[in-house]
């Protein structure tokens, strides 16, 4: 069914379009089939736990696509470096920091282009990259997990590299997604564990971490059509009143950040997705039911629930109840469906899994790594495929 068929889906399936879910494992087994048939998700995200071989991965995504009423968005965090979900089946990709320290704009263009084509050949149509965080020398000392994932120390540096990366990636027909809005480089902890608190003022945020977003939003030729919102807390610009002392909410479930800042002030009217709602920054404060409804009410279009099938089902059931009860209005539902349909219309169908071309792409990354003098733990074999590199945590 074409993307605009989203409006003719049964109500329960329309609600499913708001979910981006993870899959249990490498096989399209009965558990996986049941999960997709129950939720009918608008998106599927892949992690290292789902990856065994190129043929296996493509078959997994093709099977999910075949039973979906509308083609899902198939996404992955394929940044390179620390966050490289495909390193067990493809040459490990260099980190953003390695490219930036080498001053290699041609290299980041190659990384974006190769990543985009590789993903389409494996069955994907979306990449949750690039990371837009600014990591100054002072921020490098923080334990937020972003040290090697950033493209720069200044807004201009981040803008330069991410612009070229996006052109390379999206030029292949694979959608990119800027993350983690509105910028958590100044946060002191990792969102997987706790809520990072960023104490910048509104004006400082606009001048620093938001500056690359603002510039890219205004460049029509670069077609930024998706943003991921972080779980960071921003006490100097977003405190929800009505409780004693105010309540600091994660950005992903904050109307102040998603609607007032991103939608209204910065006028971004395209797809907005949450970071994983099972991360510690959310899970230690909210039930999955509460987080799901709050995120949608805040203005998010798609809700990532990545790890636990039970949490995915509970999140879906809670949003369906909220919609049936009138807590979520028909107008609000239609607005998000429209933005999801736009993204799906832009997403291109998969390319053939041509193993000769796959090897050529692998060789391009191998050459880039050599130019950068970049290695990631383990080794690469003569064919350039990944060796015994460790698998990152999900």
Identify the residue ranges that each predicted region occupies.
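Glycine-rich, aromatic-flanked loop segments that form ligand/cofactor-binding clefts
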Residues: 65-91, 108-136, 158-162, 166-182
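Divalent metal-coordination and catalytic microenvironments
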Residues: 10, 44, 77, 119, ...
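Preference for extracellular/luminal or secreted protein segments
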Residues: 1-39, 254-255, 264-265, 283-394
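A charged helix-plus-loop insertion that forms the helical arch/lid used to bind
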Residues: 90-104, 148-152
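Short, basic, glycine/proline-bearing loop/turn elements
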Residues: 19, 41-50, 100-101, 149-151, ...
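Catalytic domains of carbohydrate-active enzymes, especially glycoside hydrolases
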Residues: 34-47, 114, 118-126
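Short, conserved phosphate-binding/catalytic loop or strand-edge motifs used
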Residues: 134-145
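Second-shell residues forming the walls of enzyme active-site clefts
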Residues: 22, 28, 49-67, 72, ...
